[in-house]
Structure formats: structure tokens, C-alpha cells
Design a protein with these regions (language model features):
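Feature marking well-ordered beta-strand scaffolds used for ligand recognition
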Residues: 1-318
């Protein structure tokens, strides 16, 4: 079992007292690895510290022929102080060592997970011609009446489709299709932008890996973004077909029921429902509830079900 840890208060010893100092040898931000052979007594058997913590991670391959699991780590937190982790470099202009604009490739030896380590931190957003690490969206709006989109310096979520050797990355300011034939060296196949997306949050393949749904977490998951006057292509899903290793936009989808100004609502996590010969997606919308849509026809997604609760009575959300 692999667990992502990003919070600054997290401790190496899992203690409850937190960590208060700016730089501390007691802090843990990265991935924890557990042996869960005995489900009633999970045991931590490995841990890997990273410069930006671990917001999400993706198991890309393994066990390999040499008994290793390969994981992509996506950290979205601030870069650690170099007094805490010497190799961590923040946003220093012109410094190619920066921990920004990268993902981490982590190797976990099954025979001894305590030896797990970062083997590389590829600059997956770099401009292939200039070498600039900030090679994709630089942040800001796209013109009049468009969304203000975050700079692409991190991936929030990378989803893999192992049999096709591809991955889809929701990477703050862009959606990316990766070639992972060599899992140690992911390569960009295509990059897309959306003038209505604020923050590319998650990516989900359909059953056969021919489509990708990207979600936009406009407002950071803490604001009302499903009001009657909010654009239907802001804080929504974007559906793409994969054609010749390129992402071709087909449509947007957003839950159809307007929510109140007090209801925290925006596209959040979702999952494919494995129905043969159909593409069906269940989507969470925080206090907006959940929706199920059929996107078998990528250009015309159909509402199948909507569950929404009264935020005044139920503040749990989905």
C-alpha cells in the first residue's frame, strides 16, 4: 500500500503533535509504503521524502522483471527549505535545479521497500527547443471573458493506461497525454489548454483508453461554482477523444442543477463505471452532490442520474 503525504504537520514517526518549525528533521512529506499482508496489522516498510510532498501518486509499472514497482509522484505543495532537505531548490530565476516543473519517478524494490528512492525528477513541461523548464502555460487569462488559468508547474493527477503505455496528466494549467513506454522517461505526446479551465485537477480514461475526461477545480474546491450564472464550461469536465496520439476536444459537461451561493460546488474526483460497450462516468461535485453521465458519444454527453442534497441540512458533500 502506498500513501501520499503532503501536509507540513506530518511527522516521520506519525506522531500527533505535528511539526512547528520551518525546517525540521522530524517532518515527513512524500510517500509512505506499507506491507498489508496482514490487513489487521499494516506495517510501514518504506518511506521516500520529496521536495514538494506527495499530493497524488500513480503506480505506473510493476512488479518489473527485476522486482520493482515504479511510481509517479505529483507534489503540489511549496518547495521545502534546503535546510530541511538539501537537494530542494525553490523558485530561483534561472536555476535549473528547481523542484518546480517536475514530477518524481520513484522506484520501490519489493524485496526491500526500505531502499525505495527517487530515481529521477523529469522536467515534463520543458520546451524541447529552448530547454526552458516553464515550457507550457505561463499562467493568466486567455483574453477577454476567459478564465484565469494556473501556471503549469505541477501535475495534480496522473492516470495511467498500462496496456496502451500512455498516461493522462491533469497538470494545473494544461492537460497532457504522455507516452510511458519507458516508464522511467515519460514523454509528452500532446498538450491541450482550455480557456474555461482554472486548474486542471484530474484525468480519467474510458474503458478502452480511447478517451480522456479532464476536470477543472475552479475555486480550489472551496467555493460555490455551480450557481445559475456560472458558465457551464467553467468548473466542468472536458471530454477528449485520443486520435493518433493526439487529444481532440469533443465537449464539456457540468452538472445540470444550479446550486445555491452557499454550496461549495465544482467538478472534483470521478470514476469510470465499467459497463461493456458504453462509457459511463460518476462525478463528485462536493456539496453539489454527484452525477452520472454517459459519454459514449463524446460530443453529446447524456445525464443519467443526479443526486444533490440540501446544504443547509447536510454539509458533508461528496
Amino acid at each position: 500500500l502506498i500513501m501520499s503525504v503532503e501536509e507540513n504537520r506530518s511527522r516521520i514517526d506519525c506522531g500527533l503533535e505535528g511539526v512547528s518549525r520551518d525546517a525540521s528533521p522530524e517532518r515527513f512529506r512524500g510517500i509512505r509504503i506499507f506491507d498489508i499482508s496482514d490487513l489487521e496489522r499494516p506495517k510501514q516498510v518504506g518511506a521516500v521524502q520529496t521536495c514538494r510532498g506527495s499530493h497524488t501518486h500513480s503506480v505506473v509499472d510493476g512488479p518489473t522483471a527485476d522486482g520493482k514497482i515504479i511510481v509517479y509522484n505529483s507534489g503540489t505543495g511549496g518547495v521545502r527549505d534546503d535546510e530541511e532537505m538539501e537537494e530542494c531548490v525553490g523558485n530561483i530565476a534561472g536555476d535549473q535545479r528547481t523542484a518546480l516543473f517536475r514530477i518524481d519517478v520513484i522506484e520501490i524494490p519489493i524485496s526491500d521497500p526500505s531502499k525505495s528512492r527517487i530515481v529521477s525528477s523529469p522536467a515534463v513541461f520543458a520546451d524541447p527547443e529552448t530547454g526552458s523548464l516553464a515550457g507550457l502555460w505561463r499562467g493568466g487569462d486567455h483574453g477577454d471573458e476567459t478564465q484565469d488559468t494556473r501556471r503549469t508547474d505541477q501535475c495534480h493527477d496522473i492516470t495511467v493506461f498500462p496496456s496502451a503505455k500512455i498516461a493522462a496528466g491533469a497538470c494545473s494549467g494544461n492537460g497532457i497525454l504522455f507516452d510511458i513506454a519507458d516508464p522511467y522517461n515519460p514523454k509528452r505526446l500532446d498538450v491541450v489548454t482550455d480557456i474555461g479551465f482554472a486548474y486542471w485537477h484530474s484525468a480519467t480514461f474510458n474503458n478502452d483508453g480511447t478517451k480522456v475526461i479532464f476536470t477543472d477545480e475552479w475555486g480550489g474546491g472551496g467555493r460555490a461554482r455551480c450557481r445559475a450564472w456560472d458558465p457551464l464550461d467553467w468548473g466542468a469536465d472536458a471530454i477528449y477523444d485520443i486520435v493518433d496520439n493526439k487529444l481532440e476536444f469533443r465537449s464539456h459537461y457540468k452538472m445540470p442543477a444550479p446550486q445555491m451561493e452557499t454550496e461549495n460546488c465544482v467538478a472534483h474526483n470521478g470514476s469510470i463505471i465499467p459497463v461493456p460497450n458504453r462509457d459511463i462516468f460518476v462525478q463528485a461535485w462536493y456539496q453539489g452532490g454527484l452525477s452520472i453521465m454517459d459519454f459514449t458519444d463524446s460530443s453529446n454527453p447524456i445525464d443519467c442520474l443526479l443526486y444533490t442534497s440540501d446544504a443547509a441540512d447536510d454539509v458533508r458533500g461528496v
